[in-house]
Amino acid sequence: MLRAVLLPTLLAFGAFTPVHGANSPGCGKQPTLTNGVNQINGREYVLKIPDGYDPSKPHHLIFGLHWRGGNMYNVVNGDSIQPWYGLEARAQGSAIFVAPNGLNAGWANTNGEDVAFIDAIMEQVEDDLCVDQASRFATGFSWGGGMSYALACARAAEFRAVSVLSGGLISGCDGGNDPIAYLGIHGINDPVLPLDGGVTLANTFVSNNGCQPTDIGQPASGSGGSVRTDFSGCSHPVSFIAYDGGHDGAPLGVGSSLAPDATWEFFMAA
C-alpha cells in the first residue's frame, strides 16, 4: 500500500462552495468563434462548440490537454485515447471543449506561460460563448496531466475540478494551497511517471481539502482491474484510481470506459 499522507493544514475548510457561479459575458450573444483552430496571443487551440448550440444556455467548459510529443489534434481525433478523452460523447451537447496546443509539444509552463495561455483562452471563449463559470474542468494524460495539476495549483478558484491521468510534477505548482476537486488515475506499473509520484500530487489536495489520511488501494498486478480510493472528510472531493497498467492515455485500453466514466462522473458530482 502507498500511504496517502495528510500534510499539516492551517485552515479547516467548511462545506463546498462553488467557484464563481456567474454566467459568462458570452451568454445571449451570437458567437463569432467557430469550431476548429483558433488563435490567441500567437498560440493555437481547437474549439468544439456542441451541435445545436444555444447561446442562452450556460455550458460546461472542459480543457483536454495533450501529452509529451503530442498536440491538440491528438486529443480531438482520439489518437491512442477516445476523442476528447471520452468526455464529449458523455457530455451530450452540454459542454464546450478546448484542446490547447503546447509549446515544443509539451507543457513546461516556464514562468507560468502555459497557465497564462489557458487564462487567455478562457477569456476569449467566455467573452464569446455561454459558459457556466462554476463549471470549468481540465484533464490530460502524462504531461497533460502534469499541466492539469498545475492548473489545480494556480487556478483552484477558476476551475471546479481536474482529472490527472498518469501525471507528475512536470509543469510546476504555483500556489498549490487552495482546495479544488481532484481525481488522480494512475497505472501501478507506470515506468515513466511512477505511481508514487501520482499519489504525491493527490496528497497536495488531500491536505488542501482537509481530507482524512487513507491508504491508496491497488489491484493485483496482472489482474486487469482497478481500485478506487475516495477520501473522506474533504471540503472538495478527492479520489484516486490505481489500475493494473503502465503509462497509458487510455487506462485498461482505448475501449475501456474506466477513465472517461470516472472523469465525467467526478466532474459532474464535484
UniProtKB/Swiss-Prot annotation:
E.C. no: 3.1.1.73
Signal peptide annotation: 1-21
Temperature note: Optimum temperature is 37 degrees Celsius.
Subcellular location per the Swiss-Prot or TrEMBL entry: Secreted
Gene Ontology MF terms in the entry: feruloyl esterase activity
Catalytic activity: feruloyl-polysaccharide + H2O = ferulate + polysaccharide
Keyword hit for Secreted: yes
pH dependence comment: Optimum pH is 6.1.
Coiled-coil ranges per UniProt: none
Enzyme class at the top of the EC tree: hydrolase
InterPro entries named among the record's database cross-references: AB_hydrolase_fold, FaeB/C/D
GO cellular component: extracellular region
KW Phosphoprotein (keyword) present: no
Keywords of the record: Carbohydrate metabolism, Hydrolase, Polysaccharide degradation, Secreted, Serine esterase, Signal, Xylan degradation
Conditions for induction: Induced during growth on suberin.
Family: Belongs to the faeC family.
Alphabetical list of PANTHER family matching this protein: FERULOYL ESTERASE C (PTHR38050:SF1), PTHR38050
Protein name: Feruloyl esterase C
Species per Swiss-Prot/TrEMBL record: Emericella nidulans (strain FGSC A4 / ATCC 38163 / CBS 112.46 / NRRL 194 / M139) (Aspergillus nidulans)
Gene that this sequence comes from: faeC
